[in-house]
Amino acid sequence: MTDLLRRPLTEITALLARRELSPVELMQATLDRIDAVNGKLNAFVAMRDRDALLADAREAEARIQRREARPLEGVPLGVKDLEDAAGLVTTHGSRVFKDNLV
């Protein structure tokens, strides 16, 4: 699935729209990759619960099935740690803000 994550966004969104790729499959591949490399990279400082992310992916899949998809429906999104995100710790890259929950 790592190959999937190297594809351009235009291809990913087309695969999702044609239902050749499931948002759940894409989210699972993304989470598996994060699990595999984040210990070394520490690219993701805070994340929502895995089960919640997969539930969101299932909801996205349902919207796609109903043809109610939004432009980036089903595409996992990471938010830079410099931007506040509700419910997530935002450190702004500093240990001073290690407990900064918005």
Enumerate the predicted regions with their spans:
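An N-terminal boundary/leader segment
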Residues: 1-55
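Hydrophobic transmembrane alpha-helix bundles
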Residues: 6, 63-65, 83
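Secretory-pathway/luminal and periplasmic proteins that interact with or process carbohydrate-rich
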Residues: 36-41, 67, 84-90
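Alpha-helix initiation/capping motif
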Residues: 48-49, 70, 93-94
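Glycine-rich loop at the start of a catalytic domain that most often binds anionic cofactors/ligands
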Residues: 56-61, 84
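Immediate post-signal peptide segment of exported/extracytoplasmic ligand-binding proteins
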Residues: 60-76
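Enzymes and membrane/adaptor proteins characterized by extended Gly/Ser/Thr/Asp/Glu-rich
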Residues: 73-102
